[in-house]
């Protein structure tokens, strides 16, 4: 009898036996004889035999031997079929090809096994054959390609797990499945000029040898697709030079655009250039030495504010230089402040050593001086 399970190398191992037939007669005949029609309808809808057989079985009396009758009937049918085949062959009404390229399969003959079902799917649906008309060719979606036996064969191998591709399945153009998408062009085409008339519809189609623009060109006329128009629609005469394109915008500071992937100029880690205000007032970042008069005040007067700024900048005591990209964050929590003892800065000694955090507003002359309690707070010297 041989093994029940056979393993093809590379394939999934499964029962190598035919699937059960759709029409299972003995059960149906038995139930017909019992006369229970509801049971037939509920238990086995697929196993109800053809109506002719039902009539024959119902016409028999239950005492007759059904199985003998059926055997006799099968023999008769086989003989009839053989006779018909011989007749056909003899009269040569049929051409026999050993392996037909395409077979029409009825739905009932399709196997219920998932791999096999997927392999035979190519024979159904409109997406597989060549487009029959021009209109279909235009309206067709992207993924449909006409294909010959080659791809069918390879897809069959693939679906039966006899063929494994590590790459994307580029060769399968089936609707709704993963296909390789076309890359976007690096330099997109310039926008098309205004096109009027029937050429507007066919503008995006590939030109075929019979199309209208070729006919026009053969007659010496220029197709309207190639005519440039003004904004109002008037045709620009051929030979007019195009307006010169403006040169690409230069970098304002004239330095190389990208030193590495994410840098701008000499400030590493920043994508944007620092604002000109930041470049002008390049303060130190942490504890500022301020005259006693400035402590805790808000300066509205521009001259006084500017004076405080100047004095503060000249006396700033801090080891950490200002990082320019921090100016974009309203409250950076993470920049390291190495606050040092005052190096001989003359201040009147106070509760916190005369150290004050100034908050500068870049757009206005306002300066807020806030005394700090622990050496500088982590918000010291922030620009708002």
Swiss-Prot record:
Coiled-coil residue windows: none
Amino acid composition bias (Low complexity), ranges on this chain: 74-84
Biased composition (Basic and acidic residues): 177-186
Region annotation Disordered: where it falls in the sequence: 1-21, 60-84, 177-255, 326-350
Family of this protein: Belongs to the FAM157 family.
Name this polypeptide is given: Putative protein FAM157B
Source organism of the structure: Homo sapiens (Human)
Gene it is expressed from: FAM157B
């Amino acid at each position: 009898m041989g093994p029940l399970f056979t393993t093809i190398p590379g394939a999934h191992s499964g029962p190598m036996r035919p699937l059960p037939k759709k029409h299972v007669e003995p059960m149906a005949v038995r139930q017909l004889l019992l006369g229970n029609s509801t049971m037939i309808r509920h238990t086995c809808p697929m196993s109800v035999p053809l109506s002719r057989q039902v009539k024959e079985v119902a016409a028999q009396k239950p005492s007759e031997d059904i199985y003998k009758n059926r055997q006799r009937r099968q023999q008769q049918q086989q003989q009839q079929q053989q006779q018909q085949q011989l007749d056909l062959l003899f009269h040569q009404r049929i051409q026999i090809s050993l392996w037909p390229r395409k077979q029409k399969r009825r739905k009932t003959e399709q196997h219920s096994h998932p791999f096999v079902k997927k392999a035979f799917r190519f024979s159904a649906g409109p997406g597989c054959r060549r487009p029959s008309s021009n209109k279909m060719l235009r309206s067709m979606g992207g993924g449909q390609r006409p294909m010959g036996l080659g791809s069918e064969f390879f897809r069959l191998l693939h679906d039966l797990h006899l063929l494994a591709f590590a790459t994307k399945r580029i060769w399968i153009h089936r609707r709704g499945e993963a296909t390789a998408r076309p890359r976007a062009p690096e330099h997109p085409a310039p926008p098309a000029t205004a096109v009027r008339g029937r050429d507007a519809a066919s503008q995006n189609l590939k030109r075929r040898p019979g199309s209208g623009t070729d006919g026009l060109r053969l007659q010496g006329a220029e197709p309207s697709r190639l005519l440039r128009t003004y904004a109002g629609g008037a045709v620009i005469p051929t030979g007019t030079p195009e307006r010169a394109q403006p040169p690409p915008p230069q970098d304002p500071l004239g330095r190389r655009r990208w030193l590495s992937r994410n840098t701008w100029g000499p400030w590493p880690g920043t994508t944007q250039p620092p604002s000109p205000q930041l470049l002008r007032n390049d303060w130190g970042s942490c504890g500022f030495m301020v005259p006693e008069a400035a402590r805790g005040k808000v300066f509205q007067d521009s001259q006084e504010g500017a004076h405080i700024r100047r004095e503060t900048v000249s006396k700033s005591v801090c080891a950490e230089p200002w990082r320019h990209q921090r100016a974009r964050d309203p409250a950076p929590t993470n920049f390291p402040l190495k606050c040092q003892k005052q190096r001989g800065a003359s201040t009147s000694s106070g509760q916190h050593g005369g150290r004050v955090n100034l908050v500068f507003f870049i757009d206005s002359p306002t300066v807020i001086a806030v005394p700090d309690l622990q050496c500088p707070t982590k918000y010291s010297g922030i620009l708002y």
